């Protein structure tokens, strides 16, 4: 009897032990499956993907006839309108609407949380807050006068940003020096102040070696007037100096023609930037302690100051981190979104760097192709290469394209404005002809040429830059002329002379008109045959 009771007790213990092991395996498997999915940036989703994602985030099934199942109509043609207004009037209306709804473009906020909150509750609150934020942006997309650029739609990516902002004393927003305001997110600075009023945000103006010194002076004046903390920096130049290798790219050579004594225009080196970051972060910590504010739970366990790096993809965050660390610690590539998780890197006993994945913040823009040309969206996923090349052709001077690629672009016709930029088709076909890019169909491989031109544009091989908003278009053209040199000025004078009404003969005018008709398919086949026979006679 006792033996049987002992046996049954042992079996019960073994059964309970096996049951606990099975539960542990199932929990581990579910955790592994949950984190097995690679963290990937998502900027565009289809209608069905959006419906499924909303259903998962809301943790309930959507009815078939739910309102959100109806695709939101988005008018991507910003130059047209059903009311028949001109393109200029449409642009003015769009700018007024953007100014009216500028405050609606916010970074998603992390809901309030406490260390005592369990994982399920925290996850549900974050999903609900993110879903509410997505719905607010969807309501903006319903406005036909607004064009919302693609933005990050993966909650896990935004979670990385939340962690970095909470851990960091100083937030460094890395921007491209050629157009700093395009990459700057003012609401991110406001969000950092909401988390902790003592946090500061610094603009790290990367790729500053691509700007002439007078352009850096203009931007330095603009940043100072608007109380923006900034530093000019070049990750590529710092890496080359660290490795003891000269810059191979001649277009990235330091600007020695125009020197200035303004210290604000100086392009910082590695040691100077580390000292500046440490100084700014220590001031924040001292100010926080002097006012009796306790440190957050993440930073109270150590005396290190934390500097977090945030910004758009492909602006040079990972390159900057590698240059500051002194060795390759984060992946660097021309494709946006290489960094998947935030990383903490210890520089010294009192300084820690925190790298955040690149985020595409929501913004208003006239075209998504500007984001492709800027490198924010991947070039390899580009579908309309002509529109993206059009952006490059309009921003880079004609002579600069010809000098860089050693090509000769077709000149404008006599009936066209002589100062017009080259067409995208002209640039692509000329480039394909000079490089021998031919597709399998026998036609010029314009897609391959477009990808190469866009990569050169992003890398800085094709020179371009934007001026501060206070600079008028005429002033920008005048300052740009100063950097082009004597050859450029001679070329521009030739173009200005060409703008005057030339004395054309009747035969030349007829030839131009016939070529225009042929290009637009306005000439019938009979006319072509008659013209050929007339020439033979």
From Swiss-Prot:
Region (Disordered): 484-508
Region entry G1, spans: 311-318
Residues covered by region (G3): 355-358
Domain CP-type G: 158-362
Metal-binding keyword on record: no
Renumbered ranges of motif DARXP motif: 176-180
Tissue specificity note: Ubiquitous, with the highest expression in stem and hypsophyll on day 66.
Subcellular location(s) per record: Cytoplasm
Residues reported in the UniProt entry to bind GTP: 206-209, 314-319, 358
Cellular compartments per GO CC: cytosol
GO molecular function, one term: GTPase activity
Note: Although LSG1-1 does not show a nuclear localization, is not associated with ribosomes and the lsg1-1 mutant does not show any rRNA processing alterations, it might be redundant with LSG1-2 since it can partially complement a yeast lsg1 depletion strain, it binds to rRNA and a lsg1-1 and lsg1-2 double mutant is lethal.
Listed name of the protein: GTPase LSG1-1
Species classification: Eukaryota, Viridiplantae, Streptophyta, Embryophyta, Tracheophyta
Gene that encodes the chain: LSG1-1
């Amino acid at each position: 009897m006792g033996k049987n009771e002992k046996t049954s007790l042992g079996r019960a213990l073994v059964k309970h032990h096996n049951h606990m092991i099975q539960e542990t395996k199932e929990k581990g498997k579910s955790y592994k499956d949950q984190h097995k999915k690679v963290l990937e940036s998502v900027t565009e989703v289809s209608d069905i993907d959006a419906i499924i994602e909303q259903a998962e985030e809301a943790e309930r099934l959507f009815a078939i006839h739910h309102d959100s199942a109806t695709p939101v109509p988005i008018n991507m043609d910003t130059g047209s309108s059903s009311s028949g207004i001109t393109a200029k009037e449409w642009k003015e209306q769009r700018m007024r609407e953007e100014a009216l709804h500028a405050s609606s473009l916010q970074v998603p906020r992390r809901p309030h949380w406490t260390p005592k909150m369990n994982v399920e509750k925290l996850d549900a609150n974050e999903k609900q807050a993110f879903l509410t934020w997505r719905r607010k942006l969807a309501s903006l997309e319903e406005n036909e006068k607004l064009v919302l650029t693609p933005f990050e739609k993966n909650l896990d990516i935004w979670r990385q940003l939340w962690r970095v902002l909470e851990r960091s004393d100083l937030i460094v927003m890395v921007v491209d020096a050629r157009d700093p305001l395009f990459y700057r997110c003012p609401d991110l600075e406001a969000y950092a102040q909401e988390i902790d009023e003592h946090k500061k945000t610094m603009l790290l103006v990367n790729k500053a070696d691509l700007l002439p010194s007078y352009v850096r002076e203009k931007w330095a004046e603009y940043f100072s007037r608007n109380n923006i903390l900034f530093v000019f920096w070049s990750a590529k130049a710092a890496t080359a100096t660290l490795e003891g290798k000269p810059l191979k790219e001649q277009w990235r050579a330091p600007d020695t023609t125009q020197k200035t004594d303004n210290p604000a225009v100086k392009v910082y080196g590695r040691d100077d930037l580390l000292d500046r970051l440490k100084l700014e972060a220590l001031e924040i910590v001292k100010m926080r302690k002097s006012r009796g504010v306790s440190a957050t739970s993440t930073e109270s366990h150590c005396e290190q100051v934390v500097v977090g790096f945030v910004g758009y993809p492909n602006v040079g965050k990972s390159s900057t981190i590698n240059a500051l660390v002194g060795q390759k610690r984060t992946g660097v590539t021309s494709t946006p979104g290489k960094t998947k998780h935030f990383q903490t890197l210890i520089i010294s006993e009192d300084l820690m760097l925190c790298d955040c994945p690149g985020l595409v913040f929501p913004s208003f823009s006239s075209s998504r192709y500007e984001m492709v040309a800027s490198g924010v969206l991947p070039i390899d996923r580009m579908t309309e290469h002509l529109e993206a090349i059009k952006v490059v052709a309009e921003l880079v001077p004609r002579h600069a394209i010809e000098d860089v690629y050693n090509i000769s672009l077709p000149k404008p016709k006599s009936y066209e404005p002589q100062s017009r930029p080259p067409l995208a088709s002209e640039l692509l076909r000329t480039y394909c002809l000079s490089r021998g890019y031919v597709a399998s169909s026998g036609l010029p491989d314009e897609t391959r040429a477009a990808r190469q031109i866009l990569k050169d544009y992003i890398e800085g091989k094709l020179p371009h830059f934007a001026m501060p908003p206070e600079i008028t278009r005429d002033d920008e053209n005048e300052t740009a002329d100063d950097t082009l040199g004597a050859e450029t000025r001679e070329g521009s004078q030739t173009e200005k002379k060409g703008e005057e009404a030339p004395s054309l003969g009747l035969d030349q005018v007829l030839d131009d008109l016939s070529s225009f008709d042929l290009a637009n398919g306005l000439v019938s086949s009979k006319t072509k045959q008659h013209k050929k026979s007339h020439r033979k006679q």
